[in-house]
A protein has these predicted regions:
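Short glycine/serine- and small hydrophobic-enriched flexible loop segments
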Residues: 106-107, 146
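Long all-alpha helical scaffold domains
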Residues: 99-103, 117, 129, 133-136
Length: 206
């Protein structure tokens, strides 16, 4: 579903009031909400504190280490009572939500292949059969399937950044170019720097 909006977003998204009313009417005491916009949190008391949060950036794939815990949480809740349902949302309720729902379909072996699971999601979620369309997000569904089929657990490794290389720097009109770099790890700011290059310096360096 789309993000349950509280302020101006209610004009073009699901309102919090309408979302709560729907869940209370059809699934009272038997629903859990999964928020994939962790930094856009809301008061969980709207949903009687039945909210779990997983942070994912818009238009990005999830971190692999989040996919299995999400699937386990969904599966445990659904298995606890046959009346239980889960409501998963990001912003529009399509890309990030689709990745994690497809991961869960992989988790329960709903279809044999990641492609079949993503095709199924596209059919039941959208009117134009365009569900999970961003290549990196689709790729992570395949990654998760690979881990599941081989009973592997993903463990994040320590990485060392030793350089940044521009293979094709931008060619813009103007005398100077500004390059900026922002480094973050797990949404924690690490380092930032920027510098200017003249058109001639850029030509000689690259």
């Amino acid at each position: 579903m789309g993000f349950p909006a509280i302020d101006q977003e209610k004009i073009y998204r699901n309102s919090m009031e309408a979302t709560v009313a729907f869940l209370e009417r059809y699934h009272a005491d038997h629903y859990m909400v999964f928020n994939l916009r962790g930094r856009h949190a809301y008061d969980p008391s709207y949903f009687h504190n039945r909210v779990m949060t997983f942070e994912m950036d818009d238009h990005h794939p999830p971190r692999l280490e989040l996919m299995a815990p999400f699937c386990r949480a969904v599966h445990d809740y659904l298995a606890a009572d046959e009346q239980n349902v889960v409501a998963v949302h990001c912003k529009a309720g399509k890309g990030r939500t689709g990745v994690m729902i497809c991961a869960y379909l992989v988790y329960i072996n709903f279809y044999c292949s990641p492609r079949q699971n993503m095709d199924y999601y596209s059919i039941v979620r959208t009117v134009n059969n365009k569900g999970v369309t961003i290549p990196s997000q689709r790729r992570y569904v395949y990654y998760f399937s690979h881990l599941r089929k081989r009973n592997l657990n993903y463990m994040p490794l320590r990485c060392e950044l030793i350089g940044v290389y521009f293979e094709r720097p931008p060619r813009l009109n103007g005398l100077y170019f500004e390059f900026s770099f922002v480094f973050c790890f797990n949404y924690i700011f690490i380092f930032f720097f920027s510098f200017f290059l003249s058109h001639m310096e850029l030509f000689h360096k690259f």
